[in-house]
């Protein structure tokens, strides 16, 4: 078995990118990134992500990892990185915003009524960010296995 646990445990702490890629609707965004010695994060194609570096601890520095961001944990009011909107799906009171971060596809799930931003449409370039109320997920780029907080703080 790839992972054993309650649905909530599997959702909140997927053991691998494989599990993360199908748990949740839509599933977690998986973004290959590299982290330099100062804790600065950039995508494989060199786009800087201004995610607070206090969340990037020593064990992750100077490594290539995968950053996992849940679609509902991305804020349209954030200012950490820029994406190009490819398509917007309206699903009742929610919208799914399909974007490109460089060459990486990501999906944002946003409540239509709770956001203070103006509506977005295909072709728009917008600035977004990781909602700091929620944890970031880190995975080993080679094995796909989750990098646990216990491993990080050890």
Where are these regions (language model features)?
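Non-catalytic connector elements of ABC transporters
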Residues: 26-30, 38-154
């Amino acid at each position: 078995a790839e992972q054993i646990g309650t649905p909530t445990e599997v959702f909140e702490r997927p053991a691998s990118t494989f599990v993360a890629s199908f748990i949740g609707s839509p599933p977690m965004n998986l973004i290959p990134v590299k982290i330099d010695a100062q804790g600065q994060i950039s995508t494989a194609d060199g786009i800087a992500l201004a995610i607070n570096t206090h969340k990037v601890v020593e064990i992750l520095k100077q490594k290539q990892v995968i950053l996992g961001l849940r679609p509902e944990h991305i804020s349209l009011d954030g200012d950490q990185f820029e994406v190009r909107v490819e398509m917007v799906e309206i699903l009742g009171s929610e919208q799914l915003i399909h974007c490109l971060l460089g060459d990486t596809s990501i999906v944002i799930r946003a409540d239509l009524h709770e956001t203070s931003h103006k509506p977005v449409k295909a072709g728009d370039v917008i600035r977004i960010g990781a909602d700091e109320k929620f944890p970031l997920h880190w995975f080993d780029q080679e094995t796909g296995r989750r990098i646990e907080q216990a491993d990080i703080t050890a």
